[in-house]
Regions:
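A short-motif feature that recognizes glycine-rich, charge-decorated loops
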Residues: 51-90
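Short, well-ordered, aromatic-rich surface patches in folded extracellular/luminal domains
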Residues: 2-31, 65, 80-161
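A short, structured loop/turn motif at beta-sheet edges
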Residues: 42-44, 69-76, 109-118
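Glycine-rich catalytic cores of cysteine/serine-nucleophile enzymes that process amide/ester linkages
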Residues: 28-64
Length: 161
């Protein structure tokens, strides 16, 4: 499905597009409803922020924590996405290992292409693919760089049920 949306050159697409958001979810192996996600996105003033959503179980509310991200850190991360070829990881073949009671880890990149009217594009890198050792090294670096951009805590709220 990803190839149909983007064609075969996802890395080239990323180089010529503007990053809208980047999302990470570590995945879970229990059925209690625990979840965590982090998203690099822009706030209503156009500044970069990281929004983290956490819940321990279905019975608990979601805690939303917002962190600042400097423009320099966001630009450095975006540059890494473009130059590293991370988007090409979405092209890896599907893995035969699949568990229906498990939420896989995933990264999702949202881009706005340079041509107006062509719509936003999403690139998804997920656990159920066949990755090489080199791919896993890139995924570890991607994760490390993403975690490093988070700045000071701006706010923390609890979402109502």
């Amino acid at each position: 499905m990803i190839s149909r949306l983007f064609g075969k050159n996802k890395a080239g697409f990323c180089e010529n597009s503007r990053l809208i958001s980047f999302r990470y979810s570590p995945g879970y192996s229990d059925m209690r409803g625990a979840m965590h996600s982090e998203e690099l996105t822009r706030n209503e003033n156009g500044g970069w922020i990281t929004v983290c959503r956490d819940r321990d179980s279905h019975a608990e509310p979601v805690v939303v924590t917002v962190y600042s991200v400097s423009d320099a850190a966001a630009e450095d991360f975006t540059s890494f996405l473009r130059k590293s070829g991370a988007a090409s990881l979405a092209d890896r073949r599907k893995d035969d290992l699949f568990a229906t009671d498990y939420s896989p880890w995933e990264y999702e990149m949202e881009f706005d292409p340079p041509r107006s009217g062509s719509g936003r594009r999403y690139i998804r890198i997920c656990e159920y693919r066949k990755y090489s050792k080199r791919d896993y090294a890139l995924i570890r670096e991607l994760n490390s760089r993403f975690r490093a951009i988070r700045g000071e805590k701006i706010s923390e709220t609890v979402e109502p049920d």
